[in-house]
């Protein structure tokens, strides 16, 4: 599943091709992805794209009459192509531009979404969510205070979008390993110093992943079709049974909150 770095990489990749361009047409080849595609999106035809933003794992394509809100789901990707490039089997949405390009949304599993928000309004999917992890609002003190009285496993806690957005499964496992914190520990058991260390590693891991173009394990590709290269930096995720890069012990795997979790029982405590 594309996580925050992959969505941010997509935003950075498409922005030079979309910004200040006019949307000539929107083409939908399916009526429904995860949710029904709203008819209000057709209002964006003929409008100039003013800004391409991101909140959590949602891309926001802004015009004067409203915004398209895009979620990549489990297997979605966005590519910028020549407008006459033939559409493939899983190419469900085209946003044709005045510069002769098309923003094409591909999603084999159809778990993604294209939604509409009126000017100045936030869509319900963006309500009641936590701060962005790469901002100053996300720090060790904030997490220490949020953690008080919480018995849930720390990995599950940092993946809760109501606490902080965008820390997905890959980056949660990697950040906990780099922080030397066991993913099963009760959230409230972490000290203020441990929270500061974990927050620092979350920020570093996400930023490095963005700089590496994200992580391609199966479906994700950048806007130019290239894979992300952070997979080469993974230390524990997907490596059950392999040797820990720090101590040589076998990397362990278990499920926390129905998500596969990877860790070193010797290095993490």
From Swiss-Prot:
It catalyses: Hydrolysis of DNA containing ring-opened 7-methylguanine residues, releasing 2,6-diamino-4-hydroxy-5-(N-methyl)formamidopyrimidine; 2'-deoxyribonucleotide-(2'-deoxyribose 5'-phosphate)-2'-deoxyribonucleotide-DNA = a 3'-end 2'-deoxyribonucleotide-(2,3-dehydro-2,3-deoxyribose 5'-phosphate)-DNA + a 5'-end 5'-phospho-2'-deoxyribonucleoside-DNA + H(+). One of its GO terms (molecular function) is zinc ion binding. The active site is at 2 (schiff-base intermediate with dna), 3 (proton donor), 57 (proton donor), 259 (proton donor). A zinc finger (FPG-type) spans 235-269. Keywords: DNA damage, DNA repair, DNA-binding, Glycosidase, Hydrolase, Lyase, Metal-binding, Multifunctional enzyme, Zinc, Zinc-finger. Pfam families: Fapy_DNA_glyco, H2TH, zf-FPG_IleRS. Its cofactor is Zn(2+). Its EC number is 3.2.2.23, 4.2.99.18. Binds 1 zinc ion per subunit. GO terms for biological process: base-excision repair. DNA binds at residues 90, 109, 150. NCBIfam families: fpg, PRK01103.1. Monomer. Involved in base excision repair of DNA damaged by oxidation or by mutagenic agents. Acts as a DNA glycosylase that recognizes and removes damaged bases. Has a preference for oxidized purines, such as 7,8-dihydro-8-oxoguanine (8-oxoG). Has AP (apurinic/apyrimidinic) lyase activity and introduces nicks in the DNA strand. Cleaves the DNA backbone by beta-delta elimination to generate a single-strand break at the site of the removed base with both 3'- and 5'-phosphates. Belongs to the FPG family. PANTHER family: FORMAMIDOPYRIMIDINE-DNA GLYCOSYLASE. This is Formamidopyrimidine-DNA glycosylase. It comes from Vibrio vulnificus (strain YJ016). The gene is mutM.
